[in-house]
């Protein structure tokens, strides 16, 4: 007699079977048959079936599915592979043997219902019997208790129809376990309450008896996993079209015992947890399986994932090779959406690697943008049309070629957002808008746009975009000297940083930069050195690598290592094509600082004139204002020319809402008044107010070195006017100056 498990269905049934139909999915929020099986494992653990020395693999197995972002494959095969080697407290039985028996003792929806009703008895505070519990009780705050409660709460919210659907999907999930244990066949013969003996293990007969059997999937697992992947792909500012988002979602929609999906989930899980080696290995296995299956349409998406992975871990050349393969594969397969996105991503990625490109590269970039604009419009892909306009904005800003082009493309991008009622690329748009106004010297408007974005898009924004917005706001508050607000914003950012591995590194790195800058300004060299060392523990992109070098140079200057600092600056400036214009200007300002400290005013003026020319041609108004104020401070300009210049700059400096810049303007104005005291004959009150305003501005930003410079200037002025009544004030200022007690 043929074994029930090995029986084949012959076409004698009057009901036609749909052998090629796609699998129907039954969506839940968290609960799946796999998590029901984990609940049964927790039951065994509570009854001390699992030996203490083997508890760690069991707990790792359960906790691997606690967080929806942990995208482990939800198959009984995985549980079997782990628990079949774990001996139980019952001799000659493995943990899986007892679990297998428990699984096959569930014959109806009522049996599953009883399971969920009884799970609360394993939690302290819920178990209300006066007798001592015959099993272990879990603390109500433990992760196992939380896992059980999440499963029970969702099950209790099922309608009757949903409960039946869940039972059907459980039968589908359990069926493959017939191959794991031969005694399971005999067990099913005796206990299964169906008229057809092999119904429990035969998928075809299950379909005949119950109709279409859905695969139970956790919508939270899929949605969160897809969302995190989309955030990583949009890291360089290129928004994904809707059809690509749907494709990424569909890659996770197939049956969970599908090896392709299993390796794909493992790849994503390793990637998001920061395990580069394991993620590459799982992605290679995914490549192998899709090449030997009928899913070759997914090949360009696998290559796209490879490019994102390599870029995320700093392997830039490998990322460019992978994205070029993606472009070729997408072109061959006719996937216009993937092709255009890959081209846009490559353009943006190359721009981030070569901040000041050569003319030949600029010409090539122009061709890519023209191709993207033409293709996205022809294919009616509004999200990519928007991306092209935003890329044009960034290119105009980098080149400093056309402010009209900047605002023209911003307007077109916003019109597309409104016309299509799709705001997928809106974080990128808002970030560009606030950065443009900041560059133009209108910090108040920049902060307004940041606040609007955070207020209205906090729930639908990608985690990285929202975190970057909070970090930008913290930097703006630091410029205003509002350090209590900085601490508040960083506390909010810390909560957001827990959403992914990349967010955690971004938050930790930027927070360190903020307090490193403050420590250098305070001349707190011990803390600054410690912060600089701590930066080695974070992942860096090209910009953060440069900033680390910049702060190291600032620390050298603060310590008095001027020769070492000037050598480091010249070395960085040897390859200007690798530096953004703003980075070059920051290095040039450091050279000006060194020249002023060593009283080489002619060289300082030469550098400042070049800074002013570069800042003006690239619409970097804050750098322009700072350069002009510093030029006035050095005192090489004609007295009245310098005063007229400062008078004309003050309104723009106030609009910039930048305290160090405003303090510098007051400092320069006071210095001119004191230097030309006989010629200008300013009132004593006017000069002292200028000096005090400069001191207050520097104090708010913890700039100790500049405070000392202004206090020294004030002492010089008070001595110069030679008023005996001011002698106590002079002694007071001298005492503060020499005691370094300038922050009180």
From Swiss-Prot:
Pfam families: ANAPC5 (PF12862)
GO biological process, one term: anaphase-promoting complex-dependent catabolic process
Keyword set, alphabetical order: Cell cycle, Cell division, Mitosis, Ubl conjugation pathway
One cellular component term from this protein's GO annotations in UniProt: nucleus
Nuclease among keywords: no
InterPro entries reported for this sequence: Apc5, Apc5_dom
The protein's assembly and partners: The APC/C is composed of at least 13 subunits: apc1, apc2, nuc2, apc4, apc5, cut9, apc8, apc10, apc11, hcn1, apc13, apc14 and apc15.
Entry function: Component of the anaphase promoting complex/cyclosome (APC/C), a cell cycle-regulated E3 ubiquitin-protein ligase complex that controls progression through mitosis and the G1 phase of the cell cycle. The APC/C is thought to confer substrate specificity and, in the presence of ubiquitin-conjugating E2 enzymes, it catalyzes the formation of protein-ubiquitin conjugates that are subsequently degraded by the 26S proteasome.
Family: Belongs to the APC5 family.
Stated name of the protein: Anaphase-promoting complex subunit 5
